C-alpha cells in the first residue's frame, strides 16, 4: 500500500512525502534535468547512482545531480518512507547563490551521493522539509521565499555536516557490473 502524506509544487520546486508498506523498486534507471534530493525517513533502500550502488538507511540524504543516472530498489524490510525534492535550475539556483556562499551546481558537483545524518540532524532535516511543504501547501504571503529558505537551510545543514565530520560519506557497496543492475 502507498500512502501519499503530501505532494506540493510551485515554480521550479516539487516535494512529496510517501510511505510504502509493500515492496517497491523503480522499474528502470533514469535521469532528468532537475536536481534531486531523496531523504529516507525510515526503512532501507539500495540506491544506484551512476556506476555505484549504496545501501541507504533511515536518516540519510541522497543528492542526485542533474542528468545523473539513478535508481532506487528494495533492501531489507518492505516498508519505507521517503521525501523527494525536485529542483529546477531556476529559480532556486539564483536564490541559493544570492549571498555568494553557495551555488546549486557547485554543491551537487561536489556532494553528489549519500549522506547519513545523526539523530539531531535528522530531526532538523525532517522539520525543514515538512515546513517547506507546508509553505507550498498553504500559499500564504511569501510562501515561495519561505520554502526556498527552508531548502537553503537543508543545504547548509548538509554542507556543515560534510565539512565538520570526520566520518566519510556512505561508500558504495560495489562498482562491479553485476551490482549495477540494482
PLM regions: where:
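Short, charged/polar surface micro-motifs in flexible loops or helix N-caps
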Residues: 42-44, 61, 67-69, 78, ...
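Short, Lys/Arg-enriched, Trp-marked, Pro/Gly-tolerant hinge/linker segments that flank
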Residues: 111-120, 136-149, 156-182
